[in-house]
Design a protein with these regions (language model features):
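Beta-strand/loop edge motif enriched in small/polar residues
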Residues: 1-185
């Protein structure tokens, strides 16, 4: 059975796979999961200068727990496996959102497998640089992109499925570097 992250208004009970009162239109009931690591990112500051560490979206700039990036592409942020992330996401401001699963500078030592994101207010899964691999990932009924890649993400995404909803934007958004570091994706 998966580990289910959902809003408090979901009437799902322990041992059940889903509740009965929420639909795919019920997004933004809570934030989302953010995993921040020390792998390489391609970012720049407000003056356009390269930086290897920056603040993740959705966390106040004054909070140092929101910093990610570094120089260790093999960084290990743990394991996220057999997880369902439902009815989350938040639009805080332009370019400042919380996705279902946000991965900032997460290294290849981290294991992410069998993750689904259902009915999220912004992107299903967003990678900000890093080198983590993600396999068996599903996003459905997201309000923006299914999978979004930024800041020279260099990991592999295998066995992924994106199912668009009525409010979805793109299945994939793949952006290049913000700084001068270029990685393959």
């Amino acid at each position: 059975k998966p580990i289910v992250f959902t809003g408090t208004s979901d009437n799902i009970k322990i041992g059940e796979k889903m509740g009965t009162n929420l639909t795919v239109d019920d997004a933004g009931l809570w934030g989302g999961i953010l995993i921040l690591g020390k792998a390489k990112i391609s970012a720049s500051d407000t003056e356009g200068k390269d930086i290897n560490e920056t603040q993740i979206e959705g966390i106040p700039a004054s909070d140092t727990y929101g910093l990610y990036g570094g120089s260790d592409d093999t960084d290990n942020s743990g394991t996220l496996k057999y997880v369902s992330i439902r009815h989350g996401g938040a639009l805080i401001g332009e370019g400042n959102e919380i996705n279902g699963l946000t991965l900032g500078g997460v290294g290849s030592g981290t294991k992410i497998s069998y993750v689904e994101v259902v009915s999220n207010k912004d992107d299903g899964i967003e990678f900000f640089g890093g080198a983590v691999d993600c396999d068996y990932c599903l996003t459905t009924a997201h309000d923006d992109d299914g999978i979004d890649i930024d800041q020279s993400y260099s990991g592999k995404i295998t066995n992924a499925l994106v199912v668009q909803g009525a409010g979805s934007d793109h299945a994939l958004e793949i952006d290049g570097p913000e700084g001068s570091m270029v990685a393959g994706y």
